[in-house]
């Protein structure tokens, strides 16, 4: 964890494990990569195409996301589907989600149009993950030009 520009050790609060998960996932990078592969459509026996379509259908417009630091110059539209943020990164759709618990941050996402995805796990509550993610998508977008 970073507090006042100094790295500090933090421990996961024991209360995180006293109730069933509600908006949280415990996963390794291997787990996240398998989930990403399935969501990209490469495991239809796990996530059938019709389910993927339902999960990634825009449900709620999320204008606040258009103001996200490091993202705002690229985001043209933002919605929430079922469990996924659905961004229009310039003209490239991105299916994306982030997570944050004490001491940890995570980002996962993919672009159906570009056929690429990524997952990042960091053991810090640092906002650097936003810069890493937006820079990744900027590189993907620019490589398609």
Regions found by a protein language model. Give the residues of each.
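Catalytic loop of the DD-peptidase/beta-lactamase superfamily, centered on the K-T-G motif
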Residues: 2-145
């Amino acid at each position: 964890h970073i507090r006042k520009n100094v790295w500090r050790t933090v421990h996961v609060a024991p209360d995180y494990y006293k109730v069933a998960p509600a908006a949280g996932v415990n996963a390794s990078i291997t787990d996240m990569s398998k989930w990403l592969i399935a969501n990209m459509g490469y495991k239809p026996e796990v996530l059938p195409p019709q389910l993927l379509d339902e999960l990634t259908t825009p449900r709620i417009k999320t204008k606040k996301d258009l103001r996200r630091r490091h993202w705002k110059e690229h985001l043209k539209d933002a919605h929430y589907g079922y469990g996924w943020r659905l961004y229009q990164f310039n003209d490239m759709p991105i299916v994306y989600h982030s997570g944050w618990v004490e001491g940890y941050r995570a980002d996962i996402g993919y672009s159906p149009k570009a056929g690429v995805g990524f997952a990042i796990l960091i053991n810090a509550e640092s906002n650097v993950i936003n810069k890493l993610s937006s820079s990744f998508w900027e590189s993907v977008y620019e490589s398609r030009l």
